[in-house]
Regions:
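Carboxylate-rich, polar loop motifs that coordinate divalent cations or form catalytic acidic clusters
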Residues: 1-228
Length: 228
């Protein structure tokens, strides 16, 4: 009888555990504080906050509530649209944002304001750039690549004042090709820019090849350019 009791107890416990859901799913919507139902990108920052790129602003979630950041008429915000297509975190914890109209902004988490990073240099170039990608490197450098064949190397610590934003392109002969496939920072801090006409390296290393490598892999301090 004791054996039967133990068996039934184990069976009940197993059934109870099996009946528990594997995970809890909670749904969030505009009714929960999300500024828009279309979310195109999600990231978690170093402090654990979740950030959402939506079609109506940038949203920050602390686990309980949403805080929305966007432009309003007459508020002086530099945003040309509240639609975002991509976000990523800088080394210092600010948020890089690519907007729906292909502009690049840095959201300063201290001032809670958007900075149109390329605006100062575009004034000197007398042209507006169409942003393709944003690459953040571990050492605090960000690359913004554009469809026109331009790439901008940005120092995250000084770019908010419009400083240390350097133009790279095949036109001024410091970039091999017009189309950039990938940008990689190796373990020595050298920066590899993979273009359609070869590799440009910012650092001590050199490579003599015009082959259009698409990406770089590193293993045991050895660099392997990859094509596919």
């Amino acid at each position: 009888m004791k054996t039967l009791y133990v068996f039934l107890l184990c069976l009940y416990t197993s059934l109870t555990v099996a009946a528990q859901p594997l995970c809890q799913i909670k749904h969030f919507s505009v009714n929960s504080g999300l500024s828009q139902g279309v979310v195109v990108n999600i990231m978690q920052d170093k402090k654990g906050f979740l950030w959402f790129a939506t079609w109506n602003g940038l949203n920050k979630f602390d686990g309980y509530t949403f805080k929305n950041y966007k432009a309003f008429p007459g508020d002086g915000c530099t945003l040309t649209t509240n639609r975002f297509s991509y976000i990523t975190e800088s080394k210092d914890g600010d948020i890089w944002c690519k907007s729906y109209d292909n502009r690049a902004y840095l959201f300063d988490i201290q001032t809670e304001k958007f900075i149109d990073i390329l605006l100062p240099i575009e004034s000197s170039l007398q042209q507006t750039n169409t942003v393709s990608n944003i690459y953040t490197l571990n050492k605090g450098i960000t690359w913004i690549t554009c469809e026109q064949g331009y790439a901008f190397r940005i120092n995250e610590q000084t770019c908010k004042e419009g400083k240390d934003i350097i133009l790279y392109s095949s036109f001024n002969q410091n970039l091999k090709g017009n189309k950039i496939f990938d940008i990689y920072e190796d373990s020595d801090g050298d920066e590899w820019i993979m273009t359609d006409k070869g590799v440009t390296i910012i650092g001590k290393k050199r490579i003599n090849s015009d082959y259009p490598f698409k990406m770089v892999k590193e293993y045991n301090k050895r660099i392997y350019p990859v094509s596919y």
